[in-house]
Amino acid sequence: MQIPRLPLVGSPASVGLTFQDVAFASRVDGVPLKGWFIPALGDSVLVIVHGGFQNRVDPTVDTLDLARDLVHEGYDLLLFDLRGRGESGGKGRSLSNIDEDIGGAIDYLKSRGYPTGKIGIIGYCSGAASACLFASRERIGGLVLDGCFTSVKDMVYNQASIRGIPRLPVDVFLPGLELAAKVFYGYEAVNPVDVVRNVQCPVLFIHEEDDDLISTVDDVKLTDTSGNPTNMLWEVDGTVHSKAYQAYPVEYVAKVSEFFRAALMTTGQAGMFSQ
């Protein structure tokens, strides 16, 4: 699916933050990506990976306000546009090569001197799914997955069920749609449930209980499948897909900050998250 390119509305200056405009290349195909580096003078850095139809200024999450709050907690931040979004190059196609864009962001942060164990990722929706895929292949310090689906197929089934569509027609048409998307648009299947067990870093799963896109069963399944008993699932009452921060900003920042303080401190050492 081709993603429309939305303009950036606002900047870190809008919420009182100093920042640097940065640019780096995606892995493999070298698509130019643009973003903001926001310093907090800490020794850890968090990468925010927006949802598929958004850019680094994601109003569904309020990434600028979230950035302000996380900087106040002492975390340096990198917000960037995935390919074909915002000011980045390339064409925006849902779920195609997003993990390589994340890889480019990690490479950039390593070039700034951050060790792997001090880098965390927060991903939303399809950005969460792609972050899970990336972390299943490469070690990072910690991972927060907000609104992550188990598989594209499960997400389609969930949407069909909500709309009263029987499962049989979905079973008939879905394989053909997936094949056409792969042939014509370079779509790559991203199914976190197939790879989450390979994620070696600590993971915090966040699920909004009134989410009409991702079912509660999905995040419970991801947490259980991950196989790490120290991974955590936070089920957020009274809010919808990717809106947990908007609904409960103080609690959200506290939980995410506490998680990363433990994860980024103990990665690679014996500690509460060691496996």
Summary of predicted features, one role per range:
Residues 38-71, 78:
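Short, surface-exposed "cap/lid" segments of acyl-processing enzymes
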Residues 57, 67, 83-113:
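Catalytic nucleophile-loop/oxyanion-hole region of alpha/beta-hydrolase
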Residues 133-185, 195:
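Hydrolase active-site cap/lid region
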Residues 198-200, 205-207, 211:
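Short beta-strand/loop motif that positions the catalytic acidic residue
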Residues 201, 215-224:
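Short alpha-helix in the alpha/beta-hydrolase fold that links the catalytic acid
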Residues 209-214, 242-243:
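Acidic catalytic loop of the alpha/beta-hydrolase fold
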